[in-house]
């Protein structure tokens, strides 16, 4: 089995925090208090890897899974996704970052100066509550400064070292403008079935030209130490925390979740076929009333331990374990690259548990999917 150095990182989580604000209990209470459900989680999740997350009830496992998929908007930290490239998606935050290079660098310099000032101040103080408060404030500013720096340098790379970045800004904006149009054409081609092959080919040529211009500009500074240093930070992954709602929705095909509670996660007004097929229609994999879709949905149902003839039944007509299988079938129907399974097999019979576990293993080997599973230690040992 290959070690982690040989495998590709699919998700890189750095200092992830998910805090929920508490209601203020006093009229003149100044300080906002929080429930720190997740506080400073850092880990790499690799392609084809099965990650088991074990912990007692209420420790924040479900919150972590939902935050990874941005169902909850994370409070702090970075969640980088490498299943698609920055060029493939061309998210709007890239343009915002490029247009604000100068102001971004200025903000970083101000934060660095503030952190240095606080550090010098608390180092002179004797041990006291005030000193530790100043130290904590300094550390928070340093973290914020580092995050601002990464947000900028991961996109522009070595151009961070230049005093005049106008040419680089223009070329980067040109590249991502073309990439965004190309991404839209590919989506229309898939979703609407419109033949856009000619336009796609033209935009690919434009994108190659834009990338060539950028490489030519980078080559001018290949012997510059500062440029090389900052260029090493350049990252073509997608920062999930900075995506807009619509952009994140586009990635739902890649990332799915099997919810812990089958009762509240299924729409009672939809049949099983409609529930499983909803994502397939939303992502343009099938057209409405397509006979092939019904055949595919029935195939997925059978794999998940549901009889195909149940396709027209509603959730209330099923037992708890069967409802859980509907949720599993809905998630796996899209053949995602990453699945968060929130105690997905805990409500199932032993025979069905092993069937679903084997199905998840097959998904991992066939699709290089990464599966994050929240289990009891006993269930974890079985996988």
For each feature predicted by the language model, list its residue ranges.
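Hydrophobic anchor residue at the start of the ABC signature
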Residues: 328, 356
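Conserved ABC ATPase "signature" region
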Residues: 291-309
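Conserved ABC ATPase signature
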Residues: 314-318, 322
